[in-house]
Regions:
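Stable alpha-helical structural segments in soluble proteins, enriched in small hydrophobic residues
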Residues: 51-55, 90, 108, 197-208
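Phosphate-handling active-site elements
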Residues: 55-60, 89-98, 112
Length: 237
């Protein structure tokens, strides 16, 4: 069954980066991406306004909202979902969350036709948020599960013989933990280090077509780490 084209707004604030993307009913794309540590609250709504104005639309034209559900900065994930919920409530529209790890893998496919991507975001506290994604008809699909893990433990549970040579390595985790990067030496370190709302649109639209968008009050973040054990580090979120 064909689905009528939708106008979809996507936003992410889960890392040091802040991004907004808009896909219109005629498949035009408008976007912004910026590094804005600790400025997400001030940047997101004005940027949403700018993107919508560039598209010559209004907020009322938006059919659904896609948000970066995490994992990432605890504060950033909360900011992103809260702003997305506020917009969705006001517009009486549904929302759908997309993994930040999947978004980076999807960008690697879009940029380099990558068939296998290992994504790792620096989770602080000596850990990474990690996942492996593989290409299925142009969509990067999770192989296994997303996890928060110490690099040493990851290397112990993932034999070097099972690593897929030539895979792209995306995210901040590889530069943060050089021993982990060395373990994946038969892979390619990508210049994709932050999730981008632009590359959440494809997965978000697929989920919307599958009727998986939910009311704002049902939208949930994905932290992976138990918030009870979350520790604030000096100068870090």
């Amino acid at each position: 069954m064909s689905v009528s084209p939708l106008t979809v707004l996507s936003l992410d604030a889960s890392t040091e980066a802040c991004s907004i993307a808009l896909s219109t009913q005629d498949n035009a794309i408008f976007q912004r991406f910026m590094l804005a540590p600790r400025e997400h609250t001030q940047k997101i709504l004005p940027t949403v306004k700018a993107v919508i104005e560039e598209a010559e639309l209004t907020l009322a034209d938006i059919d659904a909202i896609v948000y970066g559900q995490g994992p990432g900065s605890f504060t950033g994930v909360r900011i992103g979902i809260s702003i997305a919920q506020g917009l969705a409530y006001g517009l009486e529209k549904n929302m759908v969350g997309v993994s930040t790890l999947q978004a980076m893998a999807q960008e690697a496919f879009a940029a380099k036709q990558a068939d296998s991507v290992y994504a790792a975001i620096d989770a602080r506290m000596g850990e990474v948020y990690f996942a492996h994604y593989v290409n299925q008809d142009g969509v990067m699909v999770l192989n296994g599960k997303e996890t928060v893990v110490k690099p040493d433990a990851l290397m112990e549970t993932l034999p070097a013989s099972e690593l897929i040579a030539g895979s792209e390595l995306v995210g901040t985790g590889w530069a943060a933990y050089s021993d982990l990067q060395e373990y994946f030496a038969n892979c390619i370190v990508s210049d994709i280090i932050y999730p981008n709302a632009l590359h959440m649109l494809k997965q978000g639209q697929l989920l919307i077509e599958q009727d998986k968008a939910v009311a704002p009050e049902l939208a949930m973040p994905v932290y992976l780490r138990d918030t009870v054990t979350w520790k604030k580090l000096p100068g870090r979120e």
